[in-house]
Amino acid sequence: MIYKKYGRTGKEISVIGFGGMRFPKEGESYDYDKCAEFVVKANDLGVNYFDTAPGYNDDHSEFIMANAFKKMSKPFYVSTKSNDRDGAKLREQLETSLRRMNLEKINFFHIWCILDMDDYKSRMVKGGAYETALKAKEEGLIEHIVFSTHCTGDEIETIVNDDCFEGMTVGYNILNFPFRQKGLQAAYKKGLGVATMNPLGGGIIPQKADYFDFIRGEDDETVVDAALKFNASHKEITTVLAGMGSMEEVLYNCRVGDNLESLDADKLKDIEGRLFNSMDKLCTGCRYCEYCPKKIPVSKYMLSYNNHILGDTQGIFNNLKWHWGIKPEVVKECIECGLCERKCTQHLPIISRLKEIDEFSLTYK
């Protein structure tokens, strides 16, 4: 397993991290012992970063992790989260997570799912989430305060420049990399560790392997290899979180972490060029369309619409709700001025896609 330094923390983190929200159900419940076997095996194979959160797997993930931690023989680090804005509620959630996982401290505690700058400011108010986490750190209950976000690259840059955090977790993959690249670079420049989630686009990339076959290089056996390598080869990225819901997935993902050959800057630029040239129907997140006179966040709608093109219409509304906290009815504000379409580098039919999203919202939620 390859290891990278997590920012300035001094910790060496496995390039593949264990994402703890893909455990399989056995009927209507989770077999804690069976799921824990995946976690233990990953640790045996060198994974030392384990990411979980309240609510993952119907709120069972932290319990599964606890089952695994007591059986693991190699050192490991734990990442969990709270999305509470209220300081007292965050403290309660932190103590619950510690108790559930039988831990004295959380290594990486996330101010979780910052949606936009207004949301960020709400976490930073006096007596709020961040200040409470800082006090818990002083007490030794938290080792490193980090954040997770679905913000734009510009917004991420603003957050990291406030110098309040030691690391971040951010969605980053071949579908959205232009949307977040600036934030990634800003975090690296500031010395933050970076974990990336959704490296496989929430499963879309392997499900549509034929569509994305163009990203494979000469040494890549599969599209999944190429997608994981794309993330892990960025110097700015410390660890790539991969959900592992079977022993086969554990073995596969760890093999990628064992055999990773870093891509140099020229090769990464080549891949990025192929992505832009090949995804002619998909929004690449360049954000040239952002100057809507009605303040519609067009790029976020178009990135969400990518899910429909790839066969997952429900994914539009999952993204809007959980990634950005946007209501689908905002598209009704469109006055069809065409400014966004004139700015679009992909020449996408943005207006008609906004109308489709409005129509889909009658069926999907």
Feature map (PLM): residue ranges:
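Conserved residues at the C-terminal ends of beta-strands
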Residues: 19, 53, 109-112, 148, ...
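Short catalytic-loop micro-motif centered on adjacent basic/acidic residues
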Residues: 49-55, 79-80, 143-147, 167-171, ...
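Glycine/proline-rich, positively charged
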Residues: 26-27, 40, 85-196, 218-219, ...
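Structural motif corresponding to the early beta-alpha repeats
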Residues: 56, 69-88, 112-115
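Structured C-terminal cap/extension of enzyme domains
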Residues: 33-34, 41-43, 48, 67, ...
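Alpha-helix-loop-beta-strand connector modules within alpha/beta enzyme cores
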Residues: 62-80, 129-140, 196
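N-terminal binding-site loop/beta-alpha segment at the start of enzyme catalytic domains
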Residues: 1-76
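Conserved, mostly hydrophobic/aromatic
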Residues: 6, 18, 42, 50, ...
